[in-house]
Amino acid sequence: RENTRAVVMLHASNVCGTLLPAAEVGAFCRENGLLFLLDTAQTAGAFPIDMEAIGADALAFTGHKGLMGPQGTGGFLLRPELAAELEPLLSGGTGSASHSEEGPSFLPDRFEAGTLNLPGIMGLHAALTWLEEAGIDAIRAHEQALTDRFLRGAASIPNLRLVGLAGAENRAAVVPVVPENTDPAFVADALGREFGIQVRVGLHCAPNAHRTLGTFPTGAIRFSFGPYNTPGQVDRALEALDALCRRTVWL
């Protein structure tokens, strides 16, 4: 539309894990004078991300997923010109520029009103130090191998539908599945109670994505793999899924 000001996009879907063409969208935005805001909640810490190469004007991230930090942490990066244009959502005391009724005008204080979550920030710093030592490329290769292992194994489980791309190459380490013999919530509950396997079931705060994928209203069971998971754990999850998808009686 003619009045479009910005494009806001996920880097990868939190429902099906599909990686979106961020660099191509960034190039389109530059050609058409649009701002490009990229949400990297599912990719930060799990993929190499070059904000400048992608062409993003702003990049948001959460600390508790791929960055391995505590819950309640996160942040954003802004191109300097955009930072000067934006008005803070919240304003107030920061411990600096206390003489001003409007709060500080300089970065990062301008966007960090109030008392910061210092324990969370220190935890995130420790996690980032570990990530730097482990290497993002190595983490990506490990998670991709686990995802591929799961996809291959799940494809042969009866009464189970895989949602999303068939391969692991163009997706984050997120795989949703739908049992065809019962409600996904029953299987997810049994995975936790009987096998000690934690998954996320339902609509994942994205009902429209589930409508598009044909998994609304019951949703799907989402498996996610991280740097600490092992091939043996993937195999155990597959064995549990296989047993549950063959079950004929649910109480």
Each model region followed by its residue ranges:
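Active-site phosphate-binding strand-loop segment of PLP-dependent enzymes
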Residues: R1-G45
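A generic structural signal for well-ordered alpha-helical segments
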Residues: C29, A154-A155, L191-G192
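Active-site PLP attachment segment
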Residues: I54-S98
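A short glycine-threonine-serine/GTX helix/turn-capping micro-motif
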Residues: S105-L118
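Conserved PLP-dependent catalytic core of the aminotransferase class-I/II
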Residues: P119-G167, R171
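Conserved PLP-binding catalytic core of the aspartate aminotransferase-like
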Residues: Q144, D148, N159-L203, P207, ...
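PLP-dependent enzyme catalytic core of the Aspartate aminotransferase-like
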Residues: R193-E194, Q198, A209-L251
